[in-house]
Amino acid sequence: MAIEGSANMIGYGLAAIGPGVGIGLIFAAYISGVARQPEAQSRLQAIAILGFALAEALAIIGIALAFVL
């Protein structure tokens, strides 16, 4: 039983790498966009925060499933 629980947590840890990389790419693109066009900062910020929330939701769903299963 304990081995199954540990395997679930290891699986979640590996699965969390994807959203982590995705969030990094989202904010890298945001910073690059603001550096190119500072006047579009407010519009780009809203899009970046929405992208962050969607990517983070994947990680939250993953940890919920790791605890349930």
Curated annotation (Swiss-Prot):
Pfam families: ATP-synt_C (PF00137). It is found in: Cell membrane. GO terms for cellular component: plasma membrane; proton-transporting ATP synthase complex; proton-transporting two-sector ATPase complex, proton-transporting domain. Keywords: ATP synthesis, Cell membrane, CF(0), Hydrogen ion transport, Ion transport, Lipid-binding, Membrane, Transmembrane, Transmembrane helix, Transport. InterPro entries: ATP_synth_csu_bac/chlpt, ATP_synth_F0_csu, ATP_synth_F0_csu_DDCD_BS, ATP_synth_F0_csu_sf, ATPase_proteolipid_c-like_dom, F/V-ATP_Csub_sf. Its main location: membrane. The chain crosses the membrane at residues 9-29, 49-69. PANTHER family: ATP SYNTHASE LIPID-BINDING PROTEIN, MITOCHONDRIAL, ATPASE PROTEIN 9. This is ATP synthase subunit c.
